[in-house]
Amino acid sequence: MALRFPRFSQGLAQDPTTRRIWFGIATAHDFESHDDITEERLYQNIFASHFGQLAIIFLWTSGNLFHVAWQGNFESWVQDPLHVRPIAHAIWDPHFGQPAVEAFTRGGALGPVNIAYSGVYQWWYTIGLRTNEDLYTGALFLLFLSVISLLGGWLHLQPKWKPSVSWFKNAESRLNHHLSGLFGVSSLAWTGHLVHVAIPGSRGEYVRWNNFLDVLPHPQGLGPLFTGQWNLYAQNPDSSSHLFGTSQGAGTAILTLLGGFHPQTQSLWLTDMAHHHLAIAFVFLVAGHMYRTNFGIGHSMKDLLEAHIPPGGRLGRGHKGLYDTINNSLHFQLGLALASLGVITSLVAQHMYSLPAYAFIAQDFTTQAALYTHHQYIAGFIMTGAFAHGAIFFIRDYNPEQNEDNVLARMLDHKEAIISHLSWASLFLGFHTLGLYVHNDVMLAFGTPEKQILIEPIFAQWIQSAHGKTSYGFDVLLSSTSGPAFNAGRSIWLPGWLNAVNENSNSLFLTIGPGDFLVHHAIALGLHTTTLILVKGALDARGSKLMPDKKDFGYSFPCDGPGRGGTCDISAWDAFYLAVFWMLNTIGWVTFYWHWKHITLWQGNVSQFNESSTYLMGWLRDYLWLNSSQLINGYNPFGMNSLSVWAWMFLFGHLVWATGFMFLISWRGYWQELIETLAWAHERTPLANLIRWRDKPVALSIVQARLVGLAHFSVGYIFTYAAFLIASTSGKFG
């Protein structure tokens, strides 16, 4: 018999039903479960796939640059960033009638185009790119890197170039190289680019390879570096009247600590950012020399962890045994990496809008909204993945003997306390927040809005004041002119910072009130409930009260029949599955809040958010319904407009989302019956019965149907909100 898919599992390849295809796809990347896998091949496969991942990333970014250079309007956008709409790429659609062609011909283009809401124009402009030729050069370079990555992946699959397991498990060398190489050297290189290309570019000086060695980034060259007069690099910064991209009002400083924003671009000072990256480079270059390798100096990770024992002996054996547990478990390492990356991605969302790094991006409202939402959703998926792999670690890699009485064992020992406390926090937040919203709703409905329960967020306001916001009247820390912190920073970063914090046109420390207090607690409810489900899923992965012996059932078992009192919904996979719904729900609230707050800020009617956000009907009527009106108006009796594509996507998103429920709320028997009926009809129909198939069609398993349902739910949910967000924002602000 010919080799059938999947080749990595002989058992599955011989399955006579359509299960073979679905289970094959589901386990294709679960290298550990493949037939002839060894630990060495497992590590080598993963290592080689990283090169493929890099190749895809480089190809993708190369494509962005190439399409903007070919079909965009970068050069005309550079001339007037605030009024020219950036073009992502052309639209070729033979079905377009004349009204559509007119509606989508924008940004000075000759035919229908898509507008870019990704911020790439602002990014490329800030880092010194100015012409289409620059973009083409970048695209070709990234294409070259993509090819190099593919060659690297191929090379490391050849017998001679396959690294050994001991190389993969050399934690100290990896830490040193990743800290000093990935973070340190790349930050230093980026500082170099900012100082040599971007900062001169912001001052009207065009630095390229042909004049790179002739243009001094600073009038005094490297003199101050070698003589220790580093402060000279901070003298004569750009003035507040500086016009970005020109020499008008420009200074000569390259490394500053001005604080606040460039008045014209509303973004952080480039010289501040160069300084920041230099500092990061220094810290990580030092950190990358801290661990003991061939030279016998520095820390040993194992020694560090073994020494971490809580004093007094009351809290067990601390970190003993952790080194081998983590170093031998790819799932533990992946869980840690995903948790870190998820947090970082969410922080990127928060900081990209509040402290914009790219010139003029703060005035491009749709881009700000799109980037915030994009990064928050990605953070949510990555964080749930962290807990999923944490659970797989407990099932496949956790060894109780190796971890006796250390922090991992103690987490498992008192998991009931952890889960019950999280449960209590979630219940408390949920009932109290909903209670306040519903009370306020009823008061509004009965025409007595003055009877609402409105709570001022005084602690959060106090924290904002401590950072220098004066409008609340708290005389504390940086908002107190007599404090030592205030006086210490007055000569350097503080004037710029205080000016930015107290200027109401940006997103730094937005003024908050009762509506913010309520939605903050609604979000806290979502975060705690999502965490509860994920933590419980991981801590109960090996066994729980009802089913103490889950280890051999694996990560994603569906149900084990009624024998144990019914074991549906208690696998670690089920916890992940439920948590993703809560994660989407939570990020929905987060993005609703962010978007509504900002729309009213940008339109200059903040009172609408303040007054309507304290009760549920306000959210439904004044945010969702009011802002979807443009969307539903994409097609109207007068033809179509440039929002029609979002109107269509809004409908399509709802369709995909609703399709999810078809898989989520149905029984497997119903599907099997349906499939048998369809197969029977097919075989008895002339012409149709000429087409045969080898695999007997069977319904999806419980776990598969849930996965398909979850995928449709997630994609539809995000598609729908993306269309709403982009259309409602671009419809208002162009």
From Swiss-Prot:
Residues the entry annotates as binding chlorophyll a B1: 654
NCBIfam families named in the record: psaB (TIGR01336)
EC number(s) per entry: 1.97.1.12
Gene Ontology molecular-function annotations: 4 iron, 4 sulfur cluster binding; chlorophyll binding; electron transfer activity; magnesium ion binding; oxidoreductase activity
Membrane topology value: Multi-pass membrane protein
Protein name as it appears in the record: Photosystem I P700 chlorophyll a apoprotein A2
GO cellular component terms, semicolon-separated: chloroplast thylakoid membrane; photosystem I
Coiled coil: none
One GO BP: photosynthesis
Role according to the record: PsaA and PsaB bind P700, the primary electron donor of photosystem I (PSI), as well as the electron acceptors A0, A1 and FX. PSI is a plastocyanin-ferredoxin oxidoreductase, converting photonic excitation into a charge separation, which transfers an electron from the donor P700 chlorophyll pair to the spectroscopically characterized acceptors A0, A1, FX, FA and FB in turn. Oxidized P700 is reduced on the lumenal side of the thylakoid membrane by plastocyanin.
Gene3D superfamilies: Photosystem I PsaA/PsaB
Keywords per UniProt: 4Fe-4S, Chlorophyll, Chloroplast, Chromophore, Electron transport, Iron, Iron-sulfur, Magnesium, Membrane, Metal-binding, Oxidoreductase, Photosynthesis, Photosystem I, Plastid, Thylakoid, Transmembrane, Transmembrane helix, Transport
Organism: Spinacia oleracea
Subunit structure: The PsaA/B heterodimer binds the P700 chlorophyll special pair and subsequent electron acceptors. PSI consists of a core antenna complex that captures photons, and an electron transfer chain that converts photonic excitation into a charge separation. The eukaryotic PSI reaction center is composed of at least 11 subunits.
Pfam families assigned to the protein according to its UniProt record, in alphabetical order: PsaA_PsaB
Cofactor note: P700 is a chlorophyll a/chlorophyll a' dimer, A0 is one or more chlorophyll a, A1 is one or both phylloquinones and FX is a shared 4Fe-4S iron-sulfur center.
UniProt: phylloquinone binding residues: 671
